[in-house]
């Protein structure tokens, strides 16, 4: 039921974007189930002709340093995720050392021209503060992970700040 329920993230985003496909989606990743569900939701919206081609959107998996097995696998071009034995991060909800859907996330990143990136505890906490100060949104650390990765990717030129960007804040 988790996957089916999490698909609604994509339904809500599509409606808020007036049925336009986002360019970039940044998802905080623990087990990987939410990222897979979001992809499935966008695909279903395309199937019923509510969205145009979703294959051009880019999925980005965001993980905290100290528990980033999917990021490690992606950067090493591995097809399998090697578990982290002792996760150590302020983002406790993402501290899943052996992500059950990790292999599927890697497939989704390839399918959607995406990538995976990590951020450290200080970057996470700074992003939480930034979000609170600029948007009045108070998030748990997983939300800080996605915001921090967004900042990092814009600074590195991997994401154009003028793109239609969706950053999932949980």
What are the residue ranges of the model-derived segments?
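Substrate-binding/catalytic subdomain of NAD(P)-dependent oxidoreductase enzymes
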Residues: 30, 57, 128, 137-150, ...
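Active-site/ligand-binding-proximal alpha/beta "capping" segment
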Residues: 1-50, 126-131
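Short beta-strand segments
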Residues: 27-30, 60-63, 167-170
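Residue-level preference for the first positions of well-ordered beta-strands
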Residues: 24, 136, 164-166
């Amino acid at each position: 039921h988790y996957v089916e329920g999490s698909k609604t993230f994509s339904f809500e985003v599509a409606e808020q974007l007036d049925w336009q496909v986002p360019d970039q989606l940044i998802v905080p990743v623990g087990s990987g189930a939410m990222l897979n569900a979001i992809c499935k939701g966008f695909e279903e919206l395309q199937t019923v002709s509510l969205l145009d081609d979703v294959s051009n959107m880019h999925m980005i998996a965001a993980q905290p340093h100290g528990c980033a097995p999917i990021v490690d696998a992606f950067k090493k071009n591995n097809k399998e995720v090697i578990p982290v034995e002792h996760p150590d991060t302020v983002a406790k909800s993402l501290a899943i050392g052996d992500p059950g859907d990790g292999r599927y996330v890697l497939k989704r990143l390839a399918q959607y021209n995406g990538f995976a990136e990590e951020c450290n505890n200080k970057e996470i906490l700074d992003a939480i503060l930034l979000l609170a100060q600029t948007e009045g949104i108070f998030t748990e650390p997983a939300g800080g992970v996605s915001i921090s990765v967004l900042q990092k990717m814009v600074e590195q030129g991997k994401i154009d700040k003028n793109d239609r960007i969706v950053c999932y804040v949980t």
